[in-house]
Amino acid sequence: MDIKKEYKRWLANATADADVVAELKTLDDAKIEDAFYRDLAFGTGGLRGVIGAGTNRMNVYTVAKASQGLADYLKKHFKTPSVVIGYDSRLKSDVFAKVAAGVFAANGVKVNIWPVLMPVPTVSFATRYLHTSAGVMVTASHNPSKYNGYKVYGADGCQITTEAAAEILAEIEKLDIFADVKTGDFEAGVANGGIQYIPDEVYTAFVEQVKSQSVLFGEEVNKNVAIVYSPLNGTGLKPVTRTLKEMGYTNSTGVKEQEQPDGTFPTCPYPNPEIKEAMALGMEYAKKCNADLLLATDPDCDRVGIAVKNKAGEYELLTGNQTGMLLLDYICGQRVKHGKMPADPVMVKTIVTMDMGEQIATHYGLRTINVLTGFKFIGEQIGKLEQQGKADSYVFGFEESYGYLTGSYVRDKDGVDGAYMICEMFSYYATKGISLLDKLEELYKTYGYCLNTLHSYEFDGSAGFAKMQNIMQAFRGDVKEFGGKKVVKLLDYAPGLDGLPKSDVLKFLLEDNCSIVVRPSGTEPKLKTYISVSAKNKEAAEKVEVEICKSAEEYLK
């Protein structure tokens, strides 16, 4: 691509969006290069990038081009193509959703759009419920406010496969961003019926499905637990509070500054419940209210973070691995106790999620399926079970990045479901005088102590992308040890491994049942390492983890 030429073409043609026009005029040479050195990558996660002007940015033109490519793909595969569209609280999410709707309608693709911002699982749900050809969610999940994205779902409600993504990308690449995109006015589309708002009955059906995930099976528990909940200025407020209230959890307090949708995320620059800073304000509220449980969901409400009081009365954050283990053990224990465990029960987790989950699953007679990083691969396994007539065999799926799903009604992680099930689990144990931290220690005593950590390293721009590739190649060299722990085996998923799709992921199995996974993020300019350490106690595990981390970081210099 001739960067200067493309920049001048945008100056001449990208005149419909005032923000794009203004930004184009202010770009210096370095910013022009970063904005135009490539087209924004489209993959199984759809699009994700910084909001702004250029081919490597999220804007009305790149969104329209992607929508045109998706429309062309759908018309080839469906006689009467249709799509569900949802959007979150991010900057320009509603604008991008309406642009996409206009393009689909102009191409004869029937549009069903949520009338207000909604959590991402409702798009997966509505796609299945309304039997549409695809779903689109405008979101960048938990990224900083400068990002937005465009997530695509197949007719099964699962994020698109690698093959579908490649086909859609091929359609997108045929297009000129200005000459080949059919656009349509959103309001005109609504008026002529090409665009329809999704009725409230679909939202109610979603909430009912979440409520049906309860595994109390008639047991009475104390639902008067004091809860503080924050949607982190995202989409979770209405569906989470409605579900909790309808299930009897009425003693709930909101984090006022984080309740209302706000794409600038004024109280937490990184609205990710995995990050302590994002939970800080909620923890302040929890202390003031003397709450029993703090819950927070990310902006598109597919992840849940929690904090609970320890014996000293201080609030302690639980990791995604810890919460997932607790939920798995609780759900399985309840199903076994009440005779509700399905035939050939299955638990699905990602390869970077702690292996103790598999031990717990085995204890309860569940078969574990390990998949690549990304909840779409968990959703894909649910689909395979459904094709075999065994959808009910799916008991639980989770990933270390705070994503959980207890049923097959959607094919993506669900923060509404996660928040409700965590409340139910908490109240169940509280009724018996047991804290979640007590239960966690019990699991460690049964299965052994395990520490799991995630480290992220940013590499911005075109130079950063090249550096990440070089680092991955260095890791593929003859690595003997990490932090004094010898490499027992290297699992390289690039050529495909254990029947899994090809993926740029390395997993080093180390001695003493330790491991480290290295992979580039699929949605951000980051390299991630996942370290797992087994030891006799927390202190010993932390020492080993620090040394493994130091060794890994030598390759990042």
What annotation goes with each model-predicted range?
Residues 115-178, 272-296, 325-331, 346-357, ...:
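Phosphate/diphosphate-binding loops
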Residues 29-36, 40, 148-280, 284-286:
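Gly/Ser/Thr-enriched, mixed-charge loops and adjacent short helices
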Residues 79, 84-147, 246, 250-305:
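N-terminal small/polar loop signature for handling phosphorylated ligands or for N-terminal nucleophile
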Residues 2-100, 107, 188-190, 195-225, ...:
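An N-terminal, well-structured beta->alpha segment
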Residues 36-56, 140-141, 227, 231-243, ...:
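Conserved phosphate/anionic-ligand binding catalytic regions in large, soluble enzymes, centered on
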Residues 287, 291-293, 314-316, 334-519, ...:
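Phosphate-binding and adjacent anionic-ligand microenvironments
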Residues 95-104, 147-153, 302-321, 357-360:
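Short Gly/Thr/Asp-enriched flexible loops that form oxyanion-binding sites at enzyme active sites
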